[in-house]
Amino acid sequence: MRNELFQQAKSFVQQAVMVTNGFEEGDQEQAILRAKNAVSSAYANSTDAERQQLHQFQNQLDKLQ
């Protein structure tokens, strides 16, 4: 079964990275905030492996700020 919230979080993190690096247009703060919210939402319904990846996503977002 596919975890939609996890997939959303992954997508929003990728988008935040792209915006921050100038490869995509958009508001950097909003992109990071949206990604952080998605990571937080995905955490509760995730497997241990997904949680580990979510933690890595969070670290990645922290470095973008």
Curated annotation (Swiss-Prot):
Classification via InterPro entries: DUF3813
Protein's name according to its UniProt entry: Uncharacterized protein YizC
This protein's encoding gene: yizC
